[in-house]
Amino acid sequence: MIDEHPDRLRDAIVVGAGVAGLAAAGPLTAAGADVLVLEARDRIGGRLLGTSVPGGVVDLGATWYWEFEDRISTLVRRHGVATFDQHLAGDTVVEDATMVQRLPGNRLDVPARRYTDGAASVASALAGELPTDCVRMQDPVTSIDFPDPHRAVVSSRSGTHHARHVILALPPSLAVASIDFTPALPESLARLASLTPVWMGDVVKVVATYPTPFWRDQGLAGAAFSHRGPLQEIHDMSGPEGTPAALFGFARATNHDGDITTKIQRQLERLFGPAAADPTDLLVQDWSRDRWTNPPPNGETANRSLMGHPAYQRHFQYGRLHWAATETASQFAGHVEGALVAAERVVSTVQTALAEETEAAPAPSVEGKNT
């Protein structure tokens, strides 16, 4: 889509239509701000990704939230997003290099909530609060220029856009790898971003569906640890009342090469018996190879302690560039709750700035003439 108003000076442009981006855009538009959200994918939700299977939806991205996470708990109640308790009852299966053991009780899972219609229902609820023309998909941002202290010029597939503020709602390492900034970001900030890990960026998530949750009939929780792999941990992903019936697990992307489906089927059979060997569906989502989630390797080791770094709580480029991905959150970084924390912070900062700008002299035109 070509921008029909190329000279329009918006209040904010949000890069990314995951939870953080949508949660930032909502309150800003509700307060009367002119906001545009640019999303590289052909869908909203980012790492909230569900797929339909017979009997319901299974999650290939984020799965849980916890009731002590106040913002997501409030959001699902406010929007009527259906949720249910993670299944916990039953024993745990543990696998080492030579044997499989059954241990009494669930040693892996803790009380958590799941989304009946998949985690992407949260993104849909947030998007439902936005004007219909607010979000543009398949529109990756390639450069952000700050020609003067008053505005940003954002270039994307659809053209050039102008805004008073830019909100980066994508993983920091992806932002610095895929977007050219002028002036260049401070060297320390660019390095911080490049070393901040992408949550789930090194993970392969696998979902196996079945006609019934047969493991429950055997007194198993669907929870398993494995030191042999390829899946390192496994959980019950069945929907309410066990429908759809599913198990899901995580594997490190660095621990496999190519198609791992046969290895996974053999592992599931070792852990849960012959009934697990032939799932109805075996869905594999390799987040490490998702170009709009994880940047190409840069030869350096990411440092998880950098998530939520104090620098991300600040704004840059004349106070017009703001960080809002879950990796930047001061609390719950990596969770959906963290995305909401980051969005809340940025909304407050941008609203304050816009109010101050309204009280001050008018901003210059997009041609950059001073007033």
What are these regions (language model features)?
Residues 29-54:
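Glycine-rich FAD pyrophosphate-binding loop
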Residues 45-47, 55-86:
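Conserved FAD-binding subdomain of flavin-dependent enzymes
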Residues 168-188:
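Flavin (primarily FAD) binding-site architecture
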Residues 63-70, 107-125:
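Short beta-strand to alpha-helix junction loop
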Residues 137-152:
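A conserved short coil-to-beta-strand element within the FAD-binding core of flavoproteins
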Residues 13-15, 38, 141, 160-175:
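Short hydrophobic core segments
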Residues 72-93, 213-222, 277:
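A short alpha-helix-loop-beta-strand transition element characteristic
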Residues 2-7, 11, 20-23, 31, ...:
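Conserved flavin/dinucleotide-binding core of flavoenzymes
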